[in-house]
Amino acid sequence: GGAEHVVEVLEPTSEQFAARLRKTAKERRKWARREGVSCYRVYDADLPDYAVAIDVYPGAGDAEGNLYLHIAEYAAPSTIDPGKAQRRYDDVLALAPVVLGVRPDHVFSKVRRRDKGGSQYRDSSRRSYVTQVREDGYLFEVDLVGYLDTGLFLDHRLTRELVGKKAEGKRFLNLFAYTGSASVHAAGGGAKSTATVDLSQTYLDWAARN
């Protein structure tokens, strides 16, 4: 029903990516509304040539028209022509906000290329965009810009849900806990106690805020 957008793509196959994204986004939006989830993954390398993960997050106020995209590119193998991979990724960045109805300046992109030192830690040259998201009645803090990961692994949602269902009356030990989201689910599920352990004080402080 809205205005028609024309996006000039660099690779002809990018039209297939757009069609796939449109289909999966429609399904996931329905699912998110039904489950009461405000952040969710709409695409995860569904097409091998477009190896990106695209997540939808709410902005401040959780308004429908105030959405943000977090797009993470999986580093292409050395057998792929770097120029072709870059053109595909440029097409993803151009098409995704149009297909999903998100403002271009609300798109944050990263490349998932782990350094030996652990590039999940904060790059001091990056700014932050911190907001809160809702999952199963709990609020979690996420940073869409400052780190490689946002603070909440969306593909672990079912595991967190399972923890919450089985936690009642138990003592819950969360090792390599990251930002402690599983501990929140355990506490909410009636755990007798929770212990949250991580090597990073930054993430432990984040877990405490959650």
Language model features by range: what are they?
Residues C39, P104-H106, S193:
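Residues at the N-termini of beta-strands
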Residues L154-K170:
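Conserved alpha-helix/loop element of class I SAM-dependent methyltransferases that forms part
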Residues G1-H70:
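Non-catalytic accessory regions of SAM-dependent methyltransferases
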Residues P48, A53-D55, A85-F153, E161:
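Non-catalytic substrate-recognition/targeting regions of SAM-dependent transferases
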Residues A60-G61, A75-S78, L148:
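Short, surface-exposed beta-strand-loop junctions and turns on beta-sheet-rich folds
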Residues K165-N210:
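Conserved SAM/SAH cofactor-binding pocket of Class I
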Residues L67-K84:
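A short interface-forming secondary-structure element
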